[in-house]
């Protein structure tokens, strides 16, 4: 199963130099996956009061995506296991692959306020497809060299009353010297939602063409790494 949609990359999707932001790119990926999910789950009663929450992103950028581009984003649900559902995404433009990604989602029961085991009816409805992009394993580092303090804005919150997952990509842009246009790979793993915090810490360690990062307060909110071209 796969679904695709064409998107025009207008200035609202781009940063100061006309390149698409990671927040915008992931938002468009979520958009096409939501369109697919609404169609597939329309008559599945077992999905009542359940939602998909993002658990992690693996994204590889092979070509720049700029303002004025017309891109096609395709999403393919590959497989599911217990609480988790895995999706591949492919971003194409001018006959070329511009980016590919793996998104991991966790099924959440809104009534019980906990993760829910995926019902067999959902497995059958989505089916399985081979993974064309498996992402990478990542081991969180223990020691970070530097940190910044990030203020949480009311506009960062979405209808679920927590900071939108895409905003985390904006937060890591506060790392000095991080140039979003030159990112070739990014891993983002979400842990605990940002709900009541007024500020969070942004911890990071720079290496050669690589930055490890963590977003946290009294609890851990997210971590991952960025690689440059």
Language-model regions, residue ranges each:
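Hot-dog-fold acyl-thioester-processing enzymes
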Residues: 1-54, 104, 109-180
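HotDog/MaoC-like acyl-thioester-processing domains
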Residues: 4, 56-139, 190, 194-199, ...
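Phosphate-/nucleic-acid-contacting segments
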Residues: 182-185
């Amino acid at each position: 199963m796969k679904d695709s949609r064409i998107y025009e990359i207008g200035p609202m999707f781009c940063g100061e130099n006309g390149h698409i932001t990671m927040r915008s790119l992931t938002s468009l990926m979520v958009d096409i996956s939501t369109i697919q999910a609404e169609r597939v789950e329309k008559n599945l009663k077992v999905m009542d009061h359940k939602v998909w929450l993002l658990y992690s992103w693996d994204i590889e950028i092979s070509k720049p995506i700029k303002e004025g581009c017309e891109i096609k984003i395709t999403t393919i649900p590959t497989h599911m296991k217990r609480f988790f559902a895995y999706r591949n995404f492919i971003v194409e433009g001018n006959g070329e692959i511009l980016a590919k990604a793996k998104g991991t989602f966790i099924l959440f029961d809104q009534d019980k306020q906990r993760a829910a085991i995926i019902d067999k009816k959902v497995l059958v409805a989505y089916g399985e497809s081979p993974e064309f992009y498996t992402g990478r394993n990542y081991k969180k580092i223990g020691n970070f060299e530097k940190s910044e303090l990030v203020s949480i804005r009311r506009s960062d919150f979405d209808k679920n009353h927590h900071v939108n997952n895409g905003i985390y990509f904006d937060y890591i842009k506060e790392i000095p010297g991080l140039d979003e246009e030159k990112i070739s790979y990014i891993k983002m793993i979400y842990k605990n939602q940002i709900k009541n915090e007024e500020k969070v810490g942004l911890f990071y360690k720079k290496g050669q063409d690589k930055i490890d990062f963590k977003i946290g307060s009294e609890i851990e909110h997210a971590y991952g790494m960025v690689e440059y071209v």
